[in-house]
C-alpha cells in the first residue's frame, strides 16, 4: 500500500470536509458541524494565502486517509491544525509522515515554533505529539 502526501487541491474540498467531520462526530462523538469550522470552506484563504499550508495523505484509490494543516501566525511562529488519520490507517506512520512534512516546511521557512491544541478526547493524539517532541 502506497500513501502519498500531497499539497491540498481544491478538487478534494468536499471529501476533506466529510473526512474530518466523520472522524470528529463518529469516532470522538464531538458535536460539531461544517458551520463550526469555517476554515475548511476556504483552505486557500485560511491556510495557503497567509503563508501556511495544508497537506493530504492519499491512498492508492486517491482517497483521503489523513490531513494536516499549518497556519502561519507571524514571521517565525505557526499553528498545527486539523491533523487526522483514518482509523483504518493508523499505526502505519501516516501521522508521522504528515507531521514530518510540517516540521520540514517550518525549518525551510525559518519558523521557530509550532503551537498546537488538542482536547481531552484525543488521548492518542496527545501521546503522539508528546512522543514527537511537543510539550
PLM regions and their residue ranges:
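Acetyl-CoA-dependent GNAT
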Residues: 3, 7-81, 86-87, 99-101, ...
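Short glycine-rich hinge loops at helix-strand junctions in the catalytic core
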Residues: 93, 110, 133
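Short polybasic/polar patches that bind polyanions
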Residues: 90, 107, 130
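Conserved active-site alpha-helix within GNAT-family acetyltransferase domains
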Residues: 96, 120-135
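Conserved GNAT acetyl-CoA-binding A-motif
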Residues: 106-118
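Active-site acidic-Proline motif in GNAT/NAT acetyltransferases
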Residues: 86-92, 120-121
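Nucleotide phosphate-binding site architecture
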Residues: 6, 71, 90, 123, ...
